[in-house]
Structures are given as C-alpha cells and as structure tokens.
C-alpha cells in the first residue's frame, strides 16, 4: 500500500514538473517573437531620411539602400509612431 502511494506521488511530481517546463517554453517563445518583431521594426528605419508625420502619417522618405520607401505607422516599445519604412 505504501509503495503504491509512493509511486503515485512520484508520478504526480513528474507530471507537475513536465507541465511547468512546457509553460516556461511557451513564455520563452513569446519573448523571442516579441524581440524579433521589434528588431525588424528598428531595421526598417536604418539609412532613411524622412519627413513623415501628421494625423494621416504622410510625407516623404528617402532611403540609401532601397527605392521603395514610404511613410507608415509603426509599433515601437513606447507606442505607435509614424515613420519611414523601406523594402527591397
């Protein structure tokens, strides 16, 4: 009887440990995706000169490494902002 209770206790501990590790993996993945997202936004602004602004986020963008540039709203860690985004 004691050995059965001990075995059940060990199984319960293993199950609890496995589920908590999986939860930690999910949180780590969310953090990594978030940092990749902000890194990509920061990369959009490199090499660009801009006069973007106003309530409709209008203006001009000139980028040294791309001919396809435009003003658009971006999400930054501090909130929303109008900026220059280049592709290509």
UniProtKB/Swiss-Prot annotation:
Contains 5 disulfide bonds. This is Sigma-conotoxin GVIIIA. One of its GO terms (cellular component) is extracellular region. The lineage of its organism: Eukaryota, Metazoa, Spiralia, Lophotrochozoa, Mollusca. GO terms for molecular function: ion channel regulator activity; toxin activity. Expressed by the venom duct. Its main location: secreted. It comes from Conus geographus. Keywords: Amidation, Bromination, Disulfide bond, Hydroxylation, Ion channel impairing toxin, Neurotoxin, Secreted, Signal, Toxin. Sigma-conotoxins bind and inhibit serotonin-gated ion channels. This peptide selectively and reversibly inhibits 5-hydroxytryptamine 3 receptor (HTR3A) through competitive antagonism (IC(50)=53-86.8 nM). Belongs to the conotoxin S superfamily. It is found in: Secreted. It comes from the Eukaryota. The modification 4-hydroxyproline is found at residue 55.
